[in-house]
Amino acid sequence: MQAIADFEASKGVWAICPATMTFSEEILNGIMDVAAAHKNGQGADLVGINMEGPYISPKKIGAQNPKYVQGADAAMFRRLQARSGGLIKLVDVAPGEPGTLDFIRDH
């Protein structure tokens, strides 16, 4: 994380909100742990995380791994948000998928 923050600052960027990809919860846990452990002060400030998956449409996955695509899962999101120390600021979801509108209303 520090290498990313340093690189971005060297290009004039002072705040970052990096994106995850569509991974298993286990891998996302590791990403959230790294983000939570990061200390701002040198390089660009980590101001949030954009969770790009896994709550995306299986029909429009782009570069994401279809193996990990799933419906919006509020319990999983809460676990990841707790691990990140509240850093998840954006969550990409597929609005046409079952359960997504409830997820949006609740979060």
Q: Predicted segment positions?
A:
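Short, small-residue-enriched loops and turns at beta-alpha junctions
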Residues: 24-25, 64-69, 97-98
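Divalent metal-dependent hydrolysis catalytic cores, especially in the metallo-beta-lactamase
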Residues: 2-28, 45-57, 84-96
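N-terminal glycine-/serine-/threonine-rich phosphate-binding loop
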Residues: 1-6, 102-106
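Histidine/acidic residue-rich metal-binding segments in metalloenzymes
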Residues: 31, 36, 70-107
